[in-house]
């Protein structure tokens, strides 16, 4: 994600990186007005594909060949140290403030460090959009995995094409691979649609399905070389160059503001569109006659762009350990500002203290300079380095092991509380047909208390259940619950659409009484989901239990994930249900 300074430096590319990372940050902050901000990652892919391919081709042109060892060493030197720095600092922080995340963090770290995080998430069937509690703190490094695999294979393909077919065939090869990725994306996404699956991890995280942007950028890099373009062009050509950039930029903003994670076109169109719009912007801003490039070259944009890699690394971790109303209390806007400032501060520290010293060769120079010092000095320096590394490894190992042990004990207690029947409360009269109760893991957690107070005729709940699955379950169960009051929760596990909420209420519209519990999940979609639930509940005469309001200001109701309930929360939840019966 960093521009090598060996080729002509174009400030607007850093400005474009700033656009990408800001879009991703705003999306992960949970702002509903930028539902497609996650497509900033696809813009990063286009930029990386372009810059890396230009770097490779310039190297080949200068030396007549490609030193793969030097290339891979340079990539590791640029990307690895900031990642290691982030991981070590995060381990120290979460050992104190979020120990329940340590086990997953430690198990994910090797995959993050060695460029395989995306396939690890596919293997674990992690859905990028459906983590209702605290998501894995290294989940965002999936994109580093895709890029790392691109860095590994693309230079080899490039050399093969050059030797066998010549430079003229490279754009075709890049476009061919991009087309293969697009076909894989379509095939896998259609499979997901056909199966109505809740997990779409392969579509989002797979290198085969999500590398379109990288190879579109690579194809552009071969066919659109900045140093071969004329600085002086006629007005018509200049207008055309700028027009391409403006169209690409407006189109890109359109994907950010109009595409959302529930959009059925997400996997079929959004990724390729973001890549094509990114290419259009690059086509304009790398041209020396561009008047659009200065718009992306402001000092602020370049400052953010230069730190975009570190900002990307830090933003996800910081945002997930500082969730408003879960980890921190205070004014939402003040917390937004604070969290962004913390990310920028950490990114700046990373750039100055880690990235630049390594990138400039200062660290390497210090080690090479050892041989010119006296033997006593050499021994002291080597001993200091070895001792520091051992202390760092042993210290973080001890800290992480201690945090895992502490977290395991706490989670065992909470699991026992959630799974064991709670002391029965005073029974409540229910209708003759009993209760038909359905939903997700929150319903599973309250089933014993509700059963102790009421007559449950049917209960059907599952961890992670989304609206699409709930509709199918309701359709199957309603024949056996004709006379039952239906109680269900909605909106915890995914961003709802109007069609989904309408379909849910259509399935239960003939029940004697409809009770729906809204969501208090600490995700950006909560308020929008609750608004949809309230809207359709009013149309169908359903009773809404406003769990978001009831639980506000009561952190003692929740397990550490801020979603599932401990006994106090179970009682409050069931109290709200029985009050409506």
Language-model features, listed with the residues they occupy:
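Hydrophobic membrane-embedded alpha-helices
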Residues: 2-13, 19-403
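Short amphipathic alpha-helical segments and helix-helix/interface helices
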Residues: 13, 241, 301, 447, ...
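Structural recognition of the beta-strand scaffold that forms the well-ordered cores
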Residues: 45, 114, 436-438, 457-461, ...
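Structured helix-beta-strand junction loops
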Residues: 116, 288, 307, 453, ...
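Residues at alpha-helix caps and immediate loop-helix transition turns in enzyme cores, especially N-
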Residues: 156, 265, 296, 497-501, ...
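Extracellular/periplasmic envelope-modification machinery, especially enzymes
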Residues: 219, 259, 326-334, 344, ...
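Periplasmic/luminal catalytic loop of GT-C fold multi-pass membrane glycosyltransferases
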Residues: 484-487, 496, 500-511
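Active-site segments of SGNH/GDSL-like serine hydrolases
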Residues: 504-531
